[in-house]
Regions:
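Conserved small/polar residues in nucleotide/adenosyl-binding loops
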Residues: 222-228
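N-terminal cap/lid segment of alpha/beta-hydrolase-fold proteins
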Residues: 26-57
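Catalytic nucleophile-loop/oxyanion-hole region of alpha/beta-hydrolase
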Residues: 103-139
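N-terminal presequences and immediately downstream first alpha-helices
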Residues: 1-29
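Serine-hydrolase catalytic machinery in alpha/beta-hydrolase-like enzymes
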Residues: 82, 96-116, 149, 182
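Short, surface-exposed "cap/lid" segments of acyl-processing enzymes
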Residues: 59-100
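Alpha/beta hydrolase fold serine-hydrolase catalytic domain that processes acyl esters and thioesters
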Residues: 177-220
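Primarily recognizes the serine-hydrolase "nucleophile elbow" in alpha/beta-hydrolase
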Residues: 130-132, 137-184
Length: 230
């Protein structure tokens, strides 16, 4: 598609799902889990860790490729990722979903995790894709926190966008993370979401206590709770 011909349309919610919380919860429950079969590839990172890439089906031998980035505590197995990979395939695009460190179902080797400002892993994968497929169009698509990571990468001076990427899309990005965190604390539904993420993150810290103990006190992190409302 010619980028100049793209015309965004305003979002109109269904009458029976006007509220943002309703849309969030119903999408979690009702969204189809159908997606393309994945072929997992494990790539070694320059710092001695690994990343798991899940490749969808290849529509043709010259298909464009799109790297898909999930949101906070997501993975390639989440329904929204499987759905977008399915749609990309239908459009003749070869999807590859990057699982951030610790999100592929297996703890990574190093103490480090992923976060909204960490761009070295998607940068590494995009450079790898460009080396392997120099003649194919390559794009990137990020959801939520994955969108944050993608946009930050695009704005980094050392990242040559024109050489690495032909297109990029960021969806539902929390641009102001501090404001978003404060907003979550102002309602019981927001605190429900925050508790959901915190539970998952604390579990990952518990899995890596031995690795983290020389750097921080992992026990203190596993006892973190949400701040009480003033």
């Amino acid at each position: 598609m010619d980028g100049l011909s793209f015309k965004p349309a305003p979002f109109r919610a269904a009458r029976w799902a006007r509220g943002c919380h309703t849309q969030t919860i119903l999408a979690r429950i009702l969204r189809s889990a159908n997606g393309p079969p994945y072929r997992r590839e494990r790539v070694e990172t320059p710092d001695g860790d690994f990343l798991d890439l899940d490749w969808g089906s290849e529509p043709s031998l010259d298909s464009p490729i799109v790297m898909v980035l999930h949101g906070l505590e997501g993975s390639s197995s989440r329904r929204y990722i499987r759905n977008i990979c399915r749609e990309l395939f239908v459009q003749g695009i070869w999807p590859v979903a990057l699982n951030f460190r610790g999100c592929s179902g297996e703890p990574n080797r190093k103490p480090r995790y992923y976060h909204s400002g960490e761009t070295s892993d998607p940068r590494f994968v995009l450079e790898l894709l460009r080396q392997r497929f120099p003649d194919r169009p390559i794009g990137a698509l990020g959801f939520s926190l994955g969108g944050n990571v993608l946009l930050k990468l695009l704005g980094e001076e050392s990242f040559n966008v024109r050489e690495k990427l032909d297109s990029a899309v960021a969806i539902s990005v929390p641009y102001d993370l501090a404001a978003g965190s404060q907003l979550l604390e102002q309602s019981w539904m927001g605190r429900f979401y925050a508790a959901y993420f915190l539970k998952s993150l604390k579990h990952k810290v518990q899995l890596k206590q031995e690795l983290l103990s020389p750097i921080v006190d992992p026990v203190s992190y596993t006892h973190l709770t949400l701040p009480t409302k003033a």
